[in-house]
Every structure is written in C-alpha cells, then in structure tokens.
Amino acid sequence: MVQQAVVGSGITNERVIAAMAATPRHEFVPANLRNKAYLDMSLPIGDQQTISAPFIVSFMTEALDPQSTDKVLEIGTGSGYQAAVLSPLVQQVFTIEIVESLGNRARATLKRLKYDNVLARVGDGFKGWPRHAPFDKIIVTCSPERVPQPLVDQLREGGLMVIPVGERYQQTMYVLRKKNGKMQAEALRPTLFVPMTGNAEDNRQVKPDPLKPALFNGDFELTKEDYPFV
C-alpha cells in the first residue's frame, strides 16, 4: 500500500512515509471490510462516515509538516486512523469527533493500540478545544463551508492549518498559515470530504440537494444501497 498509494503518488516526507507504513489501517475499519483495508480507497466506518483513502491521509499529513514538538488538534476523529498516523510524528494529538458512537469507538481503539499521546473526546469540532489551545497545527478531516473562526483563534501565531473548504459536494484542500493574526491561504487540490456538521452545518448557506439523496455523505461512490450498515 505504502509504495503504491503513498510513495507512488508523490509523497516524499520520509517520516510521513514511515508513519503510514507503521500504522495498522485494518484496525480502523469494520471487520467485514478488512480485506480492503490496504487498498487506496475510502471505506465506510458507520454512522454515514468514512475513513479517507491512504493517499489523502498521507497528503494531508505531509501538508501539515508535522514536527516532533507540535501540539496538534484534529477535527473529525472518525475511526481514529489519522490521529494514529500523526501520533509518532508529533508531541501530542487532540482529536474531536461529533458522532458519539464513532468517537467512543475510536477512543477505545486508540487506547487498545497504545497511542498514548492521543487525547480524544466527543464534541462539536467547529468550536475547537479551547482548554488546550493554542495549537501549533490543526488538521480538519471534514468540510465546512467557511473556516471556523474558533479554529483560527486557537491556532498559534505562525501555526498551520490543513482543511478542506467549500460547498457540500465540491471543495478545495487548503493549507492556511497564521501571520500577524490573519490567515494566508494556499490552495492544494480539489477534494471531497464528508461535511462538517453541528454548528458548521447549521450555518451552511448551500443546503443538501433533495434531488440527490444518495449523495448523503460527500462520497459519490458510496450509497446506502451499497453499504446498508453505514
């Protein structure tokens, strides 16, 4: 998987490559999909959410430029896989999941696999985690329509945020750098992530399209008919 999906796709950061190779992705997917765990594809993990494809995880991780002294906030724990990849690369990971069942499951998995520098909780990621701010880096694995101001406020001066931003069905991955209190944006690539819910969804101007009910989680290839348990 690593040679094809990560190195073969242009990832060059040796620490990121090593972390991807060392992280057991099969531990973060449903048992009935473990035979697909090392394919470069997103997979459903329940509750209308997905685990991102390995290339996307490695791409976002490399864009984050993780350093061993970094305190990182992740928004959208999901299965816990992204937090697990970050764990050996940074000092500490704080991760928030809004879906209670997913958050509890991810926390149990991370604890069982002894990712001891990862602290997970259930909550609305739009609001960040003020108690542990400021953060050196923030990585967002769900898509808001606009960058949440609480996350900007909780990023330290000189810090970096990787985030997909846009409408529900069309987004762009950005890396944002905080300079003099303002965010400088660099567009990285088009992308498609599950939408950020909670406060972000309540304030979304472009609402779900009732004519496309199968497009329920931001992934065009997944429908409830394909995966009835999601």
Would you name each region that the model predicts?
Residues M1-L73, T77, V85, L89, ...:
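Class I SAM-dependent transferase core
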Residues F28-P30, M196-T197, K224-V230:
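Short, solvent-exposed loop/turn elements at domain surfaces
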Residues D65-Y174:
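Conserved nucleotide-cofactor-binding alpha/beta core module
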Residues R131, Y169, G181, K212-P213:
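Extracytoplasmic/secreted proteins and extracellular or luminal domains
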Residues I163-V165, Y169, P195, A200-Q205:
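Extracellular beta-propeller repeat domains
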Residues V165-L192:
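Conserved class I S-adenosyl-L-methionine
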Residues Q205-V230:
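Extracellular and organelle-lumenal recognition/adhesion modules and their flexible linkers in secreted
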